[in-house]
């Protein structure tokens, strides 16, 4: 496997998630400051706060008109930011999501697919399954898929007919056919990364080890880069589960994206841990980057 030179793009952050390459810049959410930040990947980072989401930002995406959608985790809303204005409510998902929202992908028609925790992760509550919620361009919403073990990072393949979601507590990437009407069907395992303990006890599941797939990015060869929320590395995975490459920056990595002018810059959201009580009042999170061989593809 190639020896990748890893550099720091941004430091002094609380906990970064939802990295996205859009219109020549890298956008990322900082959980505990509430900031959505845009940075340059070439030369100086030149960070700019483009929105603030007090109830904790996560997944990001863009509507066909160029306005930005931001997941607001704790109040279970999707917000919309138009032309640098204040965030406004695009969809309230509090009746559909049993606990905090997390990552999101937005398709070319402005439909958002949003994951959620399903249970109180940070308090160690019993594990519960959750669903993917589809938010249509007009803000209406419905559950699109159910019974997933912590649906999280999500990508849409270039043909716009396949959606793949990481089941963080299921040790797998799961694929669906994506219909013209936005429906998800034909659920199947895209890649099984590890066996997971058959338990509702979060501590027991974590102690058992294995891969916990989190945020991810698709490349032009159809492989997916996925962050392992338990082990720290970023894995390049082929459909069927073969691991093609592993990058270990020496700290935890919880999300990744491909971007840069040629689409070959792999950006990683890194921190010593994901525990809220360890991250909320510290500023140890990093945005890391390295160059890879195959450029980005699909969405986000």
Q: What feature does the model see in each segment?
A:
Residues 1-12, 187-188, 290-293, 300:
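A short helix->beta-strand "capping" segment at the edge of beta-propeller domains
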Residues 9-23, 53-72, 95-112, 118-119, ...:
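Beta-rich, blade/repeat-based domains predominating
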Residues 31-32, 73-74, 119-130, 168-170, ...:
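Short, solvent-exposed loop/turn segments at conserved positions within beta-propeller repeat blades
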Residues 35-37, 77-79, 130-133, 172-174, ...:
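A short loop-to-beta-strand structural motif that recurs across blades of beta-propeller domains
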Residues 41, 48, 64, 81-84, ...:
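Flexible "stalk/tail and boundary" regions
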Residues 41, 176-183, 292-297:
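Short loop/turn segments immediately following beta-strands, especially the blade-tip
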Residues 47-52, 88-92, 142-146, 184-194, ...:
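Beta-propeller fold detector
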Residues 258-300:
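Blade-level signature of beta-propeller repeat domains, shared across WD40, Kelch, NHL, RCC1
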